[in-house]
């Protein structure tokens, strides 16, 4: 098995890369999806979040209001650290369960936004960083998610910098071009991952 950590800032197109790698045959484990799963209604993590941040972070249906929580934590590093301390250990446990199900000879891609922030690079055989300039991140997120520019910039500033991400990368995918260019680059990266898997 080859364990690959895939990361990139908000709006970098990391999920597009993950989808393409899955199409090539990778088992993709999505940290964001797992993070949503571990805070479903009735979970211990959601109860802890409400105890920490109050009922204001719940929707009328009793689900986590991610937008409201985001407004609170992305403006305050201490609160963000507290949220991460609740959610990340549970995401880690669930991830280990999923990885344990992978067959021998599988390329497992762990799609994790906060790989650099949580010092996780050493857990992977290969780290892939999806890289775009900050202005591209801002343009994409304001256009695709309808988020105000100042909110997007606050999220970017709460994440690792481009330089910090690039410093831990074994492979960098520049995603500032076209969809076709991304297809071609991901195909090259898949070949490289196959080589690394078979040379182990």
From Swiss-Prot:
Its EC number is 2.7.1.24. Keywords: ATP-binding, Coenzyme A biosynthesis, Cytoplasm, Kinase, Nucleotide-binding, Transferase. It catalyses: 3'-dephospho-CoA + ATP = ADP + CoA + H(+). Residues 3-200 form the DPCK domain. Pathway: Cofactor biosynthesis; coenzyme A biosynthesis; CoA from (R)-pantothenate: step 5/5. The keyword Kinase applies. It is found in: Cytoplasm. GO terms for cellular component: cytoplasm. GO terms for biological process: coenzyme A biosynthetic process. One of its GO terms (molecular function) is dephospho-CoA kinase activity. PROSITE patterns: DPCK (PS51219). It is an enzyme of class 2 (transferase). ATP binds at residues 11-16. Catalyzes the phosphorylation of the 3'-hydroxyl group of dephosphocoenzyme A to form coenzyme A. Belongs to the CoaE family. This is Dephospho-CoA kinase. The lineage of its organism: Bacteria, Bacillati, Actinomycetota, Actinomycetes, Streptosporangiales.
């Amino acid at each position: 098995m080859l364990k690959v950590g895939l990361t990139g800032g908000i709006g970098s197109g990391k999920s597009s890369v993950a989808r393409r790698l899955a199409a090539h045959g990778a088992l993709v484990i999505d940290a964001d999806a797992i993070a949503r799963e571990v805070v479903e209604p009735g979970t211990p993590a959601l109860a802890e979040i409400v105890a920490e941040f109050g009922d204001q972070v719940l929707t009328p249906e009793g689900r986590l209001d991610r937008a409201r929580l985001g407004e609170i934590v992305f403006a305050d590093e201490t609160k963000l650290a507290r949220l991460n301390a609740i959610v990340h250990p549970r995401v880690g446990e669930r991830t280990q369960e999923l990885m344990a199900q992978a067959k021998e000879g599988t390329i497992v891609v762990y799609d994790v936004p906060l790989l650099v922030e949580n010092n996780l690079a050493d857990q992977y055989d290969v780290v892939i960083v999806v890289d775009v300039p900050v202005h591209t991140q801002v343009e994409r997120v304001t256009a695709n998610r309808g988020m105000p520019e100042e909110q997007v910039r606050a999220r970017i500033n709460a994440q690792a910098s481009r330089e910090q991400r690039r410093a831990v990368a074994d492979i960098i995918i520049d995603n500032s071009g076209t969809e076709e260019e991304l297809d071609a680059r991901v195909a090259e990266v898949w070949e490289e991952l196959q080589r690394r898997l078979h040379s182990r």
